Regions:
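Sec-dependent N-terminal signal peptides
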Residues: 5-15
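Short pre-active-site segment immediately N-terminal to the catalytic Zn-binding motif
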Residues: 195, 273-296
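Active-site-proximal segments of metallohydrolase catalytic domains
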Residues: 219-277
Length: 411
């Protein structure tokens, strides 16, 4: 408990100063409603373009934080910024990743163009803004890819019209001060309502059975939506990779339900799952869901990297580059000072020799262990074992980032 308290204190201290300096007053710039952007992204590793297919008035209150409007993390391959048209000031920002980022690293994606859906939920502005869709350049800097003018007084908006069958599973308070999680239940018919209730409960308790989510249970609201998210196994040729390409349909199902994070629960006992940062997480009902769901939520919620090794994946060289990985829990030692170096016990060797005697259910001492981000060499992780690698709890480095994310939604 003492260690968790220290981690939380450090996380809040780091965010506090920067947040106060950049404070955006919600009532000055925003109506209190929600603007939904349905975007299309098409391309390959050779290049891509992005455009807005639909502007939608979600006809619901803004359920995100009204005080933490600027994303303090340099995480995610993409970012959306809303800029006041008069002053140019950034009044809202969030980093995220998407399926296209993974597609372009596959053999097909290196040359063959494909189109992908994205959905962004933004606070509805009171006056004209410019919405910048940003991506990483060759040096990993965020640059504008396209800038979309939006004036709420003249924009032609569509409206949210449908929603799946909703259940309020566990609600602890004002959505603007909670982490709002929507569990979308796929594969349930009208005859399986009792099973659906049992499965909702199981998934909810799996998540709240792991730290730091257990200690933050009161900081969550959890909702259920029954409907077909069109998630499918075999994404990008990996049998266990269970994802959906139908982002617009997914958000149609969610409708006006408060939503910061999405978990797709697939009524299938075949092993599978997947997740993308600030996009969604997926888990089947396989017996290993006890580990799959928290692991995938770590990707979606915290932007954490996989720490396991799988050289057969087409993107196994993803992090062996001249630039430090974006994810906080892996490093290629290009800029280790920006990672967990300050958390290491004095005298820790870098790299740290492996300790094969560490039980797989324990993290072991903090260090710099080779083998992470799918690569057996050249990429390093903070602990022998971690939820992002195998069957241990989240390690201290992952816990620190997860605590920091909570502060974006609960303050």
């Amino acid at each position: 408990m003492k260690t968790r308290t220290i981690i939380l204190f450090l996380a809040l201290l780091m965010l506090g100063g920067a947040a106060e300096a950049q404070k955006v007053r919600f009532g000055k710039y925003f109506t209190g409603g929600t603007l939904r952007l349905d975007c299309s992204r098409e391309g390959s590793a050779e290049g891509d373009s992005v455009w807005v297919s639909r502007w939608i008035d979600r006809e619901s209150a803004w359920h995100g934080s009204r005080t933490q409007l600027l994303d303090p993390f340099d995480n995610g391959d993409y970012r959306v910024e809303m800029r006041d048209a008069r002053s140019g000031r950034v009044i809202y920002s969030r980093g995220y990743s998407n399926l296209f980022r993974e597609y372009k690293d596959t053999p097909k994606g290196r040359t063959v163009k494909a189109r992908f859906e994205e959905t962004l939920l933004l606070p509805m502005p009171k006056r004209a803004v410019n919405i910048a869709l940003m991506r990483r350049d060759g040096q990993m800097h965020l640059v504008d890819q396209t800038v979309l003018p939006f004036d709420p007084s003249t924009a032609k908006l569509e409206y949210s019209m449908r929603q799946g069958e909703r259940s309020d599973l566990e609600v602890h308070g004002d959505p603007a001060k909670k982490v709002d999680v929507v569990i979308v239940a796929q594969g349930y018919d009208d005859e399986s309502d009792q099973k659906l209730r049992i499965d909702y409960y199981r998934m909810k308790e799996i998540l709240f059975g792991k730290e730091p989510f257990a200690s933050h249970r009161q900081d969550f609201n959890v909702y259920g939506i029954k409907g077909d998210a069109e998630a499918q196994y075999g994404t990008f040729g990996a049998d266990r990779y269970l994802m959906t390409f139908s982002l617009w349909r997914l958000h149609d199902l969610i409708g006006m339900t408060p939503c910061d994070y999405i978990v797709i629960m697939v009524n299938n006992t075949t092993y599978g799952g997947g997740a993308i940062y600030n996009f969604y997480a997926v888990s089947s009902l396989h017996t290993m869901a006890e580990y799959v769901l928290p692991h995938e939520f770590g990707h979606s919620f915290g932007g954490l990297a996989d720490e396991y090794v799988d050289e057969e994946l087409s993107y196994s060289n993803l992090h062996r580059t001249a630039y430090e990985p974006l994810e906080p829990n892996i490093t290629n030692l290009t800029d280790f000072d920006s990672k967990w170096k300050s958390l290491l016990p004095q005298g820790t060797p870098i790299p740290t020799p492996p300790n094969p005697n560490t039980p797989r259910t324990e993290c072991g001492p903090l260090g710099v262990f080779e083998g992470a981000g799918y690569s057996a060499t050249g990429v390093y992780r903070p602990a022998e074992h971690c939820m992002m690698r195998d069957y241990a709890p989240f390690c201290p480095v992952c816990l620190k980032r997860l605590e920091e994310i909570f502060s974006l939604y609960t303050r």
